[in-house]
Amino acid sequence: EGQSVLVPSRALNDLTKVLAGVDQLTLRLGERDASFEAGDVRLTTMLIEGEFPNYKGLIPTSHPNRLTVSREALLEGLRRVKLLAREATPVRLAMTSDGLDLVAVTQDVGQAHESLDAKYEGTELTVAFNPDYLLQGIEVLAGDEVLIETVDALKPALVRSPEHADFLYLLMPVRVS
């Protein structure tokens, strides 16, 4: 009781696949491992040593720039723009009062551009993100809309659902020239 442990995300992802339809989960904590039993399935994983990083210090206290966009439209647009982008190519989000432009520029290939309807409050801003990390956050977000809150192009952005206040995804931008 009162014990705090760090469980690898891969183990938790595997566990969620087994939990469908299970009424009871048993957790057993060892000094260096944790076992989860659900029905006739047991998953054992090594625990991560150390303390969870103090992420609260990274969360900006004010967010002068707020973008609200359809979750499905953003997912589809990011996937289309990402098709042209190479593995390390960031996707730029250009946020204006006219909406949202997604842009990926890849040397030798060209650029992909997608315009989306969005509501934006704040100063015009372009922020670049690793498209895989941005997609991962949006894919697990519940609700029909995505709210992206930013301070500037270099500070962490918050990705949230306006309908589900308990979800928060902290995303670091990528520096682009």
Question: Where are the model-predicted features located?
Answer:
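Glycine-rich, pocket-lining loop/helix-strand segments that form or immediately flank
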Residues: 51
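Bateman (tandem CBS) regulatory domains
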Residues: 58-62
